[in-house]
């Protein structure tokens, strides 16, 4: 099953094993609906039931089955927190970054490369596309991104004039 990175364990909270999690989302309230998380560090994975999730502003606190002391919570400090893809609610519009990363990006029939990273700039996101000829920063604008096929892992773009030297990639 596909897993999605949703946060990182920052530190224990209290003495009964509750953990503070740094959420990797713009909506931390999503943690309240989780039934289970996967804690990951290096090659080790632990799948644990979520007993309670508390969200205060942008801070997330989780109580997990089997983590019931401060020492056990301390032992998972720095671990990645993941969830099964089917626990991530669909967006009303748009895509999650993890759905975009790894897509093949095309302009017409020309493969520009693979979308390696979504960069948040404030004004609009930028897609960092890495290909045989180097890196291209593609603005995430409706005028540029013409089609996204999440299932097919393909994005079609129409680059603005002057963004790249067209002959370099063709």
Curated annotation (Swiss-Prot):
User: HAMAP family under this entry?
Assistant: Ribosome_mat_RimM (MF_00014)
Per the record, the similarity remark reads: Belongs to the RimM family.
Q: Can you name one GO molecular function term for this protein?
A: ribosome binding
Stored PANTHER family? RIBOSOME MATURATION FACTOR RIMM
Role according to the record: An accessory protein needed during the final step in the assembly of 30S ribosomal subunit, possibly for assembly of the head region. Essential for efficient processing of 16S rRNA. May be needed both before and after RbfA during the maturation of 16S rRNA. It has affinity for free ribosomal 30S subunits but not for 70S ribosomes.
Give one Pfam hit by family name: PRC_RimM
| UniProt free text on domains | The PRC barrel domain binds ribosomal protein uS19.
Biological process (GO) annotations held by this record are: ribosomal small subunit biogenesis; rRNA processing
Classification of source organism: Bacteria, Bacillati, Bacillota, Clostridia, Eubacteriales
Checking SUPFAM superfamilies in the record gives: PRC-barrel domain (SSF50346), Translation proteins (SSF50447)
Subunit organization: Binds ribosomal protein uS19.
**Keyword line:** Chaperone, Cytoplasm, Ribosome biogenesis, rRNA processing
Q: Where is the PRC barrel domain?
A: 92-163
Protein name in the entry: Ribosome maturation factor RimM
Subcellular localization is given as: Cytoplasm
Question: Cellular component terms, GO, for this chain's entry?
Answer: cytoplasm; ribosome
């Amino acid at each position: 099953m596909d897993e999605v990175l949703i946060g990182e364990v920052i530190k224990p909270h209290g003495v009964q094993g509750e953990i503070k999690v740094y959420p990797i989302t713009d909506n931390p309230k999503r943690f309240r609906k989780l039934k289970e998380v996967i804690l990951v560090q290096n090659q080790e994975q632990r799948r644990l039931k979520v007993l309670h999730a508390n969200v205060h502003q942008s801070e997330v606190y989780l109580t997990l089955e089997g983590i019931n002391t401060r020492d056990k919570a301390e032992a998972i400090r720095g671990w990645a927190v993941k969830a099964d893809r089917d626990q991530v609610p669909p967006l009303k519009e748009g895509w999650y970054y993890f759905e975009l990363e790894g897509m093949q990006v095309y302009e017409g029939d020309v493969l520009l490369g693979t979308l390696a990273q979504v960069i948040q700039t404030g004004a609009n996101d930028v897609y960092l596309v890495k290909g045989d000829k180097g890196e291209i920063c593609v603005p995430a604008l409706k005028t540029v991104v013409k089609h996204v096929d999440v299932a097919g892992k393909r994005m079609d773009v129409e680059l603005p004039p002057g963004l790249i030297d067209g002959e370099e990639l063709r």
